[in-house]
Curated annotation (Swiss-Prot):
Descriptive protein name: Biosynthetic peptidoglycan transglycosylase
UniProt keyword list: Cell inner membrane, Cell membrane, Cell shape, Cell wall biogenesis/degradation, Glycosyltransferase, Membrane, Peptidoglycan synthesis, Transferase, Transmembrane, Transmembrane helix
Compartments, as annotated in UniProt: Cell inner membrane
Keyword match Signal: no
Similarity comment: family membership: Belongs to the glycosyltransferase 51 family.
GO terms (BP aspect): cell wall organization; peptidoglycan biosynthetic process; regulation of cell shape
HAMAP family according to UniProt: PGT_MtgA (MF_00766)
Residues passing through the membrane, by range: 19-39
Catalysed transformations (reactions): [GlcNAc-(1->4)-Mur2Ac(oyl-L-Ala-gamma-D-Glu-L-Lys-D-Ala-D-Ala)](n)-di-trans,octa-cis-undecaprenyl diphosphate + beta-D-GlcNAc-(1->4)-Mur2Ac(oyl-L-Ala-gamma-D-Glu-L-Lys-D-Ala-D-Ala)-di-trans,octa-cis-undecaprenyl diphosphate = [GlcNAc-(1->4)-Mur2Ac(oyl-L-Ala-gamma-D-Glu-L-Lys-D-Ala-D-Ala)](n+1)-di-trans,octa-cis-undecaprenyl diphosphate + di-trans,octa-cis-undecaprenyl diphosphate + H(+)
EC number: 2.4.99.28
Primary localization: membrane
Pathway: Cell wall biogenesis; peptidoglycan biosynthesis
């Protein structure tokens, strides 16, 4: 009897290990490949596309137009750093003090959860993982973050982030966002336009760059102040991000 009970557990354990090994090879290959090759699509884009098809929205197309950092306004990179991760050039994928503050805040305010994901973590999550909150997903995100921080330069992480970030319903990447909202290429985005796009990033399906709420305008102004405090364009040059 004991052998019959153990056998299925052994099989499941081996199956799980094989699945994890296959995922490790897949993700590791993706990290290596996308260190030099433009990213054609992300997990978030695939998830949105499949969801649209299942809902009968066959006209929905989730895609992004890849552009190099040379074709992105330096204000855009600075805006997302100012908004999302001001220690981006310094850390190895995780902002520990910010995580500690977020945990303390969430213990006091269970109804208003605060995140502390760095740009590196967001890039790993958007590129390779599914939406949702779980310890398994967080563990995978941490491993993938370490992977891209080890293999990619900070400039590459920022470039990929800007090309796969969601800026609205079906709008992925800064080039698509610049064309949709401002009718210009990403290379010509101004300070205020870059800050406005960065302002919707916490929830691009709720906040609208083409119809900004008072909160979005307030956040845009705050981001512009942070951009000045970081040192403007010189911040990007000093940290070899443009």
């Amino acid at each position: 009897m004991s052998k019959r009970r153990i056998a299925p557990l052994t099989f499941l354990r081996r199956l799980l290990l094989r699945i994890l090994a296959a995922l490790a090879v897949f993700w590791g290959g993706g990290i290596a490949l996308f260190s030099v090759v433009p990213v054609p699509f992300s997990a978030v884009m695939a998830e949105r596309q499949i969801s649209a098809w299942l809902s009968g929205e066959f006209g929905y197309v989730a895609h992004s137009d890849w552009v190099s950092m040379a074709d992105i306004s330096p204000w855009m990179g600075l805006a997302v750093i100012a908004a999302e991760d001001q220690k981006f050039p310094e850390h190895w994928g995780f902002d520990v003090p910010a995580i500690e503050k977020a945990l303390a805040h969430n213990e006091r305010n269970e109804s208003r959860i605060r995140g502390a994901s760095t740009l590196s973590q967001q890039t790993a999550k958007n590129l390779f993982l599914w939406d949702g909150r779980s310890w398994v997903r967080k563990g995978l995100e941490a491993g993938l973050t370490l992977g891209i921080e080890t293999v990619w330069s900070k400039k590459r992480i920022l470039t990929v982030y800007l090309n796969i970030a969601e800026f609205g319903d079906g709008i992925f990447g800064v080039e698509a966002a610049a064309q949709r909202y401002f009718h210009k290429p990403a290379s010509r985005l101004s300070v205020s336009e870059a800050a406005l796009l960065a302002a919707v990033l916490p929830n691009p399906l709720r906040y609208k760059a083409n119809a900004p709420s008072g909160y979005v305008r307030s956040r845009q102004a705050w981001i512009m102040r942070q951009m000045r405090q970081l040192g403007g364009e010189s911040f990007m040059t000093r940290n070899q991000l443009n």
